[in-house]
């Protein structure tokens, strides 16, 4: 077993060696390096064929038509393109958008930008387990609502939203439904031929593909229209201009092909490892599970350890690569906005750790992590006067601290 142990697969994944090997064949003069938009010679044709194969691989994993897959630079761009693109195209019908407070920043900040442009956004508060109350969602839908954007799996707590039912609700009212599926693709079955989803964002690097590549699914029947956000040569059927990065697309396609083959066995293995990790931690005093295991993704475990500072715990766990909050916002010391939206107090939100497991995680690593966390929590609490007061029966929430 090599240290440090990587348990931050929700932040990014290493490229699968099969993916890296395949990508190498699309870079140099000896490989297929052409521009897929070059229609006048075989270098271009071969590159175009490689892109087509990758597009098919992605479509097969998610049950769509390959022509519905638009390549982007990542899920952040896909979220931006979906939300801004749909809002701009359908704004004559209305200017009201619905999303949730626990969405990824790529969705929330895109919605904030649209608010500055005159759109109205309703940010729903989820239930304490992270799930959206479907009755509450129905209650905020209006005649001028044009778009609902709800993620499939939350990147911090792993909760799985009922996108099937939400899709039916949106469909019945003629509202466009966008889903950020960055964390779910390859871990949960997605069948866009059955789901009433109009737009869906995907990433390459959360599923053992390369960084810098993603895709947006745009439904063809009934046709969904979006306004381009990147202008140029009209690539990707006019929705996203820019020369296609063949090596990255091939890498993403190969990653999705492998995921389709191995998903059923891998998901079971991950769920067993996640449950093993939780079973090893759950009898620590004052430990709280954020989210809900039975409604959660198989690879994410978010736990709060009361009376322990999250930052000091992460430092104590230097042999474990884990995160507090998401990587996108971990440069700030603010407690996780996702956990705050679930109603956790600052102390519990600050003491949360997200463990996310993946393809290369072993049972031995999970057992090592359990042992290390238990020892570290014990040691840090011994140093904590708050823990001592708690053990003496003092209710810390009632203490009035004097300002100085």
From Swiss-Prot:
GO terms for biological process: [2Fe-2S] cluster assembly. Keywords: 2Fe-2S, Cytoplasm, Iron, Iron-sulfur, Metal-binding, Pyridoxal phosphate, Transferase. The keyword Signal does not apply. Belongs to the class-V pyridoxal-phosphate-dependent aminotransferase family. NifS/IscS subfamily. Master enzyme that delivers sulfur to a number of partners involved in Fe-S cluster assembly, tRNA modification or cofactor biosynthesis. Catalyzes the removal of elemental sulfur atoms from cysteine to produce alanine. Functions as a sulfur delivery protein for Fe-S cluster synthesis onto IscU, an Fe-S scaffold assembly protein, as well as other S acceptor proteins. Homodimer. Forms a heterotetramer with IscU, interacts with other sulfur acceptors. This is Cysteine desulfurase IscS. It comes from Edwardsiella ictaluri (strain 93-146). The gene is iscS.
């Amino acid at each position: 077993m090599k240290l440090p142990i990587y348990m931050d697969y929700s932040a990014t994944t290493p490229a699968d060696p099969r993916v890296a090997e395949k990508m190498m064949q699309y870079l140099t003069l000896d490989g297929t390096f052409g521009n897929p938009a070059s229609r006048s010679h075989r270098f271009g044709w071969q590159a175009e064929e490689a892109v087509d194969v990758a597009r098919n691989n992605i479509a097969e994993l998610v049950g769509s038509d390959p022509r519905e897959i638009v390549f982007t630079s990542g899920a952040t761009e896909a979220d931006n393109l979906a939300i801004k693109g749909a809002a701009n195209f359908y704004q004559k019908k209305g200017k009201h958008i619905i999303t949730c407070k626990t969405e990824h920043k790529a969705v929330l900040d895109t919605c904030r930008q649209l608010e500055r442009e005159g759109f109205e956004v309703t940010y729903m508060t989820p239930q304490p387990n992270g799930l959206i109350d479907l009755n509450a969602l129905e209650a905020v839908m209006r005649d001028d609502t044009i778009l609902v954007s709800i993620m499939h799996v939350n990147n911090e707590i792993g909760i799985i939203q009922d996108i099937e039912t939400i899709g039916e609700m949106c469909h019945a009212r003629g509202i466009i439904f966008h889903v950020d599926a960055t964390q779910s693709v390859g871990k949960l079955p997605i069948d866009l031929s059955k789901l009433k989803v109009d737009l869906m964002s995907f990433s390459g690097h959360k599923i053992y593909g390369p960084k810098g590549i993603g895709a947006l699914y745009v439904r063809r029947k009934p046709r969904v229209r979006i306004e381009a956000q990147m202008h140029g040569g009209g690539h990707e059927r006019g929705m996203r201009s820019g020369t296609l990065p063949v090596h990255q697309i091939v890498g993403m396609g190969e990653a999705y092909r492998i995921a389709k083959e191995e998903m059923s066995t891998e998901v079971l293995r991950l769920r067993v490892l996640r449950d093993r990790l939780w079973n090893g931690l759950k009898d620590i005093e004052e430990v709280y599970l954020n989210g809900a295991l039975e409604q959660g993704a198989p690879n994410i475990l978010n736990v709060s350890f009361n009376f322990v500072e999250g930052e000091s715990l992460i430092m104590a766990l230097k042999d474990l690569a884990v995160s507090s909050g998401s990587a996108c916002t971990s440069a700030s010391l603010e407690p996780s906005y996702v956990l705050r939206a679930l109603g956790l107090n600052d102390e519990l939100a600050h003491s949360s750790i997200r463990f996310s497991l993946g393809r290369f995680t072993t049972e031995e690593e999970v057992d090592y992590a359990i042992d290390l966390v238990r020892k570290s929590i014990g040691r840090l609490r011994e140093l904590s006067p708050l823990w001592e007061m708690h053990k003496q029966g003092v209710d810390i929430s009632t203490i009035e601290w004097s300002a100085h």
